[in-house]
Amino acid sequence: IFTLDTGRHFPETLDTLFDTEGKYGLRIRVMYPDAAEVEDLVANDGIYGFRYSVDARKACCEVRKVRPLNRALNGAAAWVTGLRREQSQGRAHVHFATYDPAQKLIKLNPIADWSLATLEDYVATNKIPVNALHAKGFPSIGCQPCTRAVAPGEDFRAGRWWWEQGDAKECGLHSRPTAITA
């Protein structure tokens, strides 16, 4: 089990990591971005350079998220995610099992068809630690400077990169893999 720490997380996100480790008595492997790559990125683009363009934001996500993910998945046969179809238009067609050609592995999305209500019920029933930001209007939580609370009725991911236009607001972790059919 691993998670990504971009170096820009909310304190509540890190609290959730520690709470989860405590509840389940396990150590979650934390993958960090390469320090030299972050240093180069900030030196070239500035601390908030990701707000200048979609390409600049994607470059930041590449360094802080995608490359650490690639290192974590190196040699793995499968990857289990929490993607849900309800989260956004871009995720509306997520399959339970896919082949991810970028990672060369099977990607499993076991809660792909869960609604938010189903998820919340499962979490409450099983007393799973939850990021405190969810109760403050953050249905989707990423890096602190790239995430804001959403208004009631807004899309789950409307608070992510809100300064960008359009619906295709993904960081690059979840490409469009090929569905596995029986």
Model-assigned labels for residue ranges:
Residues I1-A182:
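Nucleotide-activated chemistry modules centered on ATP-dependent adenylation/adenylyltransferase
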